[in-house]
Amino acid sequence: MSPQTETKAGVGFKAGVKEYKLTYYTPEYETKDTDILAAFRVTPQPGVPPEERGAAVAAESSTGTWTTVWTDGLTSLDRYKGRCYHIEPVPGEEDQFIAYVAYPLDLFEEGSVTNMFTSIVGNVFGFKALRALRLEDLRIPVAYVKTFQGPPHGIQVERDKLNKYGRPLLGCTIKPKLGLSAKNYGRAVYECLRGGLDFTKDDENVNSQPFMRWRDRFLFCAEAIYKSQAETGEIKGHYLNATAGTCEEMIKRAVFARELGVPIVMHDYLTGGFTANTSLAHYCRDNGLLLHIHRAMHAVIDRQKNHGMHFRVLAKALRMSGGDHIHSGTVVGKLEGERDITLGFVDLLRDDYIEKDRSRGIYFTQDWVSLPGVLPVASRGIHVWHMPALTEIFGDDSVLQFGGGTIGHPWGNAPGAVANRVALEACVKARNEGRDLAAEGGEIIREACKWSP
């Protein structure tokens, strides 16, 4: 019997509650390349030392519980426990601090975002010793990254499939998102694609309701795609939302989309869940479908500044679970600081290697090695007059997703799509000629209007 599992008669076991920091606060610990690292914003209850609360977070999200247990002697806590290895104050916040926690890799199932989140955030957020807790960032080690397939195809493969290069892609969400019949819905899809958009989109809550069952919608949208492709000579797509009440039904809808020969399907990855999303991503890679991801429900998790998770964590998790596009919001009209933070997680979606940069909200250097990139989707209240700023800020590897900015055109859907395409091509051309989009954007759009139908 090994020393760590041996028990001896007459040797007493000292039960009872002890301070977490005695076991889980280890400021001398040197992190390993294989550790998953987490940065938590901690708001403790009054009178509790930061070291104790940081250690409590490490304990309750790994091997710890509220009391000493005799079965601790049957394993190696030094191998499996989480460690709070550093604490730093939050500038301007007297009652908050950042606790850095290192988790040994063996705590996590390979290739499972579900298990990773269940461990790190599954229980500790209800800990009554904390007033609030927010997961600001994660460092995913290369050894764990390599256990994930990630996006079904990635940015370069998508461009090759679409044969579209050198500019952002254009999309539009069909409005009204609920209430249209399948045939009228398909008509709107055709008009937008025929007008010059690359994609149209189901909204997040378009699934299979009584007014429009999913199979009917898929058929009429496929007809619109093929008709617009024949008339424009361009490859088109519509994000067919495969999200369903069961994983089996979701895959059935994706199979039907593949049989129709359309290029892309869609999933609501937070409401659908990471297990369902990873399953769909694997199916899409195996069957040549692109996968568009909507982040419905994200604000429930990431909107509060002191509690929940920052969206950069959800974005990293999506890249691991799998998706070729994900909505990232838009920074048009926002404060400069928010712009930097948004572009920080946009780079985490697209780039292979991202350096630590606290000014952009990036707490850890992240190496994605061979995991494909994800196209950020800039959406939320944008229109053609935002096009210069969007082109400059997001660059070519992005999707500019309109809604009312296309459908709301006074002349109708097709002219709205034409306006989007003309504005984009004018901005890309001006940028390539060396013009300043920030200073000359309005004039560039006005010049383009003269030649727009």
UniProtKB/Swiss-Prot annotation:
The record's annotation in Pfam families points to: RuBisCO_large (PF00016), RuBisCO_large_N (PF02788)
> What is an annotated GO biological process for this record, any one?
reductive pentose-phosphate cycle
Task: Give residue numbers for the modification (N6-carboxylysine).
Answer: K201
Site annotation (Transition state stabilizer) points to K334
Classification via InterPro entries? RuBisCO, RuBisCo_large_chain_AS, RuBisCO_lsu_C, RuBisCO_lsu_C_sf, RuBisCO_lsu_fd_N, RuBisCO_lsu_N_sf, RuBisCO_lsuI
Which positions in this protein are listed as binding Mg(2+)? K201, D203, E204
Cofactor(s) it depends on: Mg(2+)
Q: What is its EC number?
A: 4.1.1.39
Q: Which terms in the GO cellular component ontology are assigned? A: chloroplast
Describe, as the record does, how this protein assembles with itself and its partners.
Heterohexadecamer of 8 large chains and 8 small chains; disulfide-linked. The disulfide link is formed within the large subunit homodimers.
- Family classification: Belongs to the RuBisCO large chain family. Type I subfamily.
Q: Please identify the protein, giving its name as recorded.
A: Ribulose bisphosphate carboxylase large chain
Q: Record the organism.
A: Galium elongatum
Q: What is the lineage of its organism?
A: Eukaryota, Viridiplantae, Streptophyta, Embryophyta, Tracheophyta
